[in-house]
């Protein structure tokens, strides 16, 4: 999924018609020029995503780390997710935007290799953090009396994720090159000592095998797994809610269950929607790049890439800012006030501390008062 974050210029045979005073490449056809209004709009959009992604994830990390009572399994995973999203916002957005517009690399050979490597690592860490959160919620809702992950398990899982992410991203370090090959036949002085950065695998089959592996590893595989977990959680919560409705008055029906279900569905939908355009673009480009018109390549890529990067802003909202505690602490964060420990009035944003040790038998035997207490305790802790 991360395979074409940079344009593979070696696949294009283009003729340049450029001004010596312009740092931007233009194709021979004037229709290939991106209007300044489009460039300006894209720059504003990328800037907004960078600001929101950095500030949102940074605030989320600081708030969780500041509060000892919030250091449960899910929040540990959320910090890991936010950190990886923070890396994407810093290492992915600005470099990719500038390079795509300029069509030549100005950040040096080290960054040429490091940038796609860090991007691939960050994306892999992000998706597998979502997988671990789905696993934890699945265990605590579907099998509350069974194995429960603790903080130690969370740290082990995070370590495994980072090792897997680094290992799966190493080909970018090995095969990413910095070369002036596309500019060797350009006589204009403006393009002297200009370089491009792209991946050059031993063969097309090697490249397609690797990019297909990333497609499964970073998108389809995790997404299917997450969907299954949350679907089972949704069914269990709905069934539990229906069982409680049979013996309690309708006025006790909690809206929190609906909020949880909507949040769970939104998590999956947001990830799938944000990454789907770039996934399709990368897949088409990898297998038959000629389908994409040369003039439309950069614009299509930037739009797809920008949509994917919006996920770095969405995750803090779903996992943090919809929670009342984060909203309160966020005010302290932006007002530069000290955080106060509130053991009594804190709610836990995740399902990791839910007291759900209730079987069908106990539900059937419980009284209406007990049902109200059980259901409200569960929902208030989410």
From Swiss-Prot:
Keywords: Cell membrane, Disulfide bond, G-protein coupled receptor, Glycoprotein, Lipoprotein, Membrane, Palmitate, Phosphoprotein, Receptor, Transducer, Transmembrane, Transmembrane helix. The modification Phosphoserine is found at residues 367, 375. The keyword Nucleotide-binding does not apply. One of its GO terms (biological process) is negative regulation of hormone secretion. It is a multi-pass membrane protein. The chain crosses the membrane at residues 34-54, 76-96, 116-136, 154-174, 211-231, 260-280, 299-319. A lipid is attached at residue 337 (S-palmitoyl cysteine). Disulfide bonds join 112-197. It comes from the Eukaryota. It is found in: Cell membrane. Residues 55-75, 137-153, 232-259, 320-382 are cytoplasmic. Glycans are attached at residues 2, 11, 17. Residues 1-33, 97-115, 175-210, 281-298 are extracellular. GO terms for cellular component: axon; glutamatergic synapse; neuron projection; neuronal dense core vesicle; plasma membrane; presynaptic membrane; synaptic vesicle. Its main location: membrane. Brain. One of its GO terms (molecular function) is neuropeptide binding. It holds the Pfam family 7tm_1. Belongs to the G-protein coupled receptor 1 family. Receptor for neuropeptide Y and peptide YY. This is Neuropeptide Y receptor type 1. The gene is Npy1r.
């Amino acid at each position: 999924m991360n395979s074409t974050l940079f344009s593979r210029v070696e696949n294009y045979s283009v003729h340049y018609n450029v001004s010596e005073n312009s740092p931007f490449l233009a194709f021979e056809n004037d229709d290939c020029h991106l209007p300044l209004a489009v460039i300006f709009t894209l720059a504003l959009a990328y800037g907004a995503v960078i600001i929101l992604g950095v500030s949102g994830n940074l605030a989320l990390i600081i708030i969780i780390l500041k509060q000892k009572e919030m250091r449960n399994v899910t929040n540990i995973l959320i910090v890991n997710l936010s950190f990886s999203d923070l890396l994407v916002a810093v290492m992915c957005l600005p470099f990719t935007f500038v390079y795509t517009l300029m069509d030549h690399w100005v950040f040096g050979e080290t960054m040429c290799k490091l940038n796609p490597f860090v991007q691939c690592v960050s994306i892999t860490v992000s998706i597998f953090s979502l997988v671990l959160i789905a696993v934890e919620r699945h265990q605590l809702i579907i099998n509350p009396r069974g194995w429960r992950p603790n903080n130690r398990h969370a740290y082990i899982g995070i370590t495994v994720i980072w090792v897997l992410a680094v290992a799966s991203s190493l080909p970018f370090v090995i095969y990413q090159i910095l070369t002036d090959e596309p500019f060797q036949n350009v006589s204009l002085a403006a393009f002297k000592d200009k370089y491009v950065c792209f991946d050059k695998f031993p063969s097309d089959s090697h490249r397609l095998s690797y990019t297909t592996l990333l497609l499964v590893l970073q998108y389809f595989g995790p997404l299917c797994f997450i969907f299954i977990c949350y679907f089972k959680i949704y069914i269990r919560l709905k069934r539990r809610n229906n069982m409680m409705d049979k013996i309690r008055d309708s006025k006790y029906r909690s809206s929190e269950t609906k909020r949880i279900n909507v949040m769970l569905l939104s998590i999956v939908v947001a990830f799938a929607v944000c990454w789907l355009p770039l996934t399709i673009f990368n897949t088409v480009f990898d297998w038959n790049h000629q389908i994409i018109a040369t003039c439309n390549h950069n614009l299509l890529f930037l739009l797809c890439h920008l949509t994917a990067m919006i996920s770095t802003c969405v995750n803090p909202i779903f996992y943090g800012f919809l929670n009342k505690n984060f909203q309160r602490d966020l005010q302290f964060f932006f007002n530069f006030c000290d955080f106060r420990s509130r053991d009594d009035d804190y709610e836990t944003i995740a399902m990791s501390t839910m007291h759900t040790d209730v079987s069908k038998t106990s539900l059937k035997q419980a009284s209406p008062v007990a049902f109200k207490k059980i259901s409200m305790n569960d929902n208030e802790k989410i």
